[in-house]
């Protein structure tokens, strides 16, 4: 089985072709970072228009790179949500229309399910069940995963997602967009423990997250301490340490609560090396394993959508003729691949 995957949920156009026997055949990605840099963040209308320009050419490139034709495809998977509604509609319209024209099934994929399954693209892939930590610009979720489509959300952010907090704090520090990776780079120059930020919601029971207060704490610290380069680095490190410690504490709590020994970490923030290092130490201390996608599949990409779509199609899950985007779409509402439609 061979699937074309289309990802257009935010500011990256990702196209990929995945074969269940041969693996990933091609992977094309166009990032809109330069387009949005002058605005300090993603402008939804500009994002949608750029997806319109880039999606079809990237599909053509992916077919050529995979050395295959449209006749060799068994289905088209596209991100239907959650995300920016205009951006989602571009991918949904193109994916559903091409599937109709080529007489093959269309599969609507949940963006976060794509991230959750991204480590399955690697040789060292996790076995079910596992605990998943999904950390991105728009979401922070702790999920107990029994199988594909069998998700219990144990905790989530009640305000800013981890990646959003990184970006907002980076902006306070005067760093260019995208701020998260730049803040992590700046933190490498920081002096440990010069500033101590709170670890929000770690003294209370439960697995929910809250990161907006850290942004406020950072803003107050910047206003009080000034903006000389070393102080900026020290604040960046203190902020990053607070986020990572908070996430690690919640992961440890969730692993003990569920009894699971495998942890999957995915989403854009999962590329953070300090986060990876701390969670590796945690899992070693608990006698467990941690799994990540490769860096290029931490951020939005078509490969994860193609893979997730393939699993759905194998289970007989595909779309009718309607075209819809779901900017809000709870992960735990998805059907199990072991369920019949």
UniProtKB/Swiss-Prot annotation:
Q: What is its EC number?
A: 2.3.1.234
HAMAP family per record: TsaD
The gene it comes from is: tsaD
Binding sites annotated in the UniProt record for Fe cation: 111, 115, 300
Q: Name one GO molecular function term.
A: N(6)-L-threonylcarbamoyladenine synthase activity
**According to its UniProt record, where is this protein located?**
Cytoplasm
Which positions are annotated as binding substrate? 134-138, 167, 180, 272
Pfam families listed in its UniProt record: TsaD
Which domain of life does this protein belong to?
Bacteria
Q: How is its cofactor bound, per UniProt?
A: Binds 1 Fe(2+) ion per subunit.
Q: Which reaction does it catalyse?
A: L-threonylcarbamoyladenylate + adenosine(37) in tRNA = N(6)-L-threonylcarbamoyladenosine(37) in tRNA + AMP + H(+)
Question: What family is this?
Answer: Belongs to the KAE1 / TsaD family.
Task: Give the principal location in a single coarse category.
Answer: cytoplasm
**Lineage of source species:** Bacteria, Pseudomonadati, Pseudomonadota, Gammaproteobacteria, Alteromonadales
| GO BP annotations listed | tRNA threonylcarbamoyladenosine modification
PROSITE patterns per the record? GLYCOPROTEASE
Please list the cofactors this protein needs.
Fe(2+)
**Record-given protein name:** tRNA N6-adenosine threonylcarbamoyltransferase
- Keywords, sorted A to Z: Acyltransferase, Cytoplasm, Iron, Metal-binding, Transferase, tRNA processing
GO terms for CC? cytoplasm
* Task performed by this protein: Required for the formation of a threonylcarbamoyl group on adenosine at position 37 (t(6)A37) in tRNAs that read codons beginning with adenine. Is involved in the transfer of the threonylcarbamoyl moiety of threonylcarbamoyl-AMP (TC-AMP) to the N6 group of A37, together with TsaE and TsaB. TsaD likely plays a direct catalytic role in this reaction.
């Amino acid at each position: 089985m061979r699937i074309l995957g289309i990802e257009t949920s935010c500011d990256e156009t990702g196209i990929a072709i995945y074969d269940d026997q041969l693996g990933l055949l091609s992977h094309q990605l166009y990032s809109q970072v330069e387009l949005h840099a002058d605005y300090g963040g993603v402008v939804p209308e500009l994002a949608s228009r750029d997806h319109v320009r880039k999606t079809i050419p990237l599909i053509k490139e992916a077919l050529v790179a995979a050395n295959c034709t449209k006749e060799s495809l068994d289905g088209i998977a596209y991100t239907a949500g959650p995300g920016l509604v205009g951006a989602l509609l571009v991918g949904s319209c193109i994916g559903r229309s091409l599937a109709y024209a080529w007489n093959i099934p269309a599969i609507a994929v949940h963006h976060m399910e794509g991230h959750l399954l991204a480590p399955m693209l690697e040789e060292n892939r996790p076995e079910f069940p596992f605990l998943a930590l999904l950390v991105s610009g728009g979401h922070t979720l702790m999920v107990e995963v029994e199988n594909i489509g069998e998700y219990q959300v144990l905790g989530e952010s009640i305000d800013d997602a981890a990646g959003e907090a990184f970006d907002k704090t980076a902006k306070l520090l005067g760093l260019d967009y995208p701020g998260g990776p730049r803040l992590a780079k700046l933190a490498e120059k920081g002096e440990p423990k010069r500033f101590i930020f709170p670890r929000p919601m770690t003294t209370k029971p439960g697995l929910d997250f809250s990161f907006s207060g850290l942004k406020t704490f950072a803003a107050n610290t910047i206003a009080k301490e000034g903006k000389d380069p070393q102080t900026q680095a020290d604040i960046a490190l203190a902020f990053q340490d607070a986020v990572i410690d908070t996430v690690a504490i919640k992961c440890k709590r969730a692993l003990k609560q569920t009894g699971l020994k495998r942890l999957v970490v995915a989403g854009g923030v999962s590329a953070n090396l300090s986060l990876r290092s701390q969670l590796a130490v945690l899992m070693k201390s608990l006698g467990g394993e941690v799994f990540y996608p490769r860096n290029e599949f931490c951020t939005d990409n078509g490969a994860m959508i193609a893979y997730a779509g393939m699993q759905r199609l194998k289970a007989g899950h595909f779309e009718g003729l309607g075209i819809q985007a779901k900017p809000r779409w709870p992960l735990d509402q998805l059907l199990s691949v072991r369920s019949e439609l």
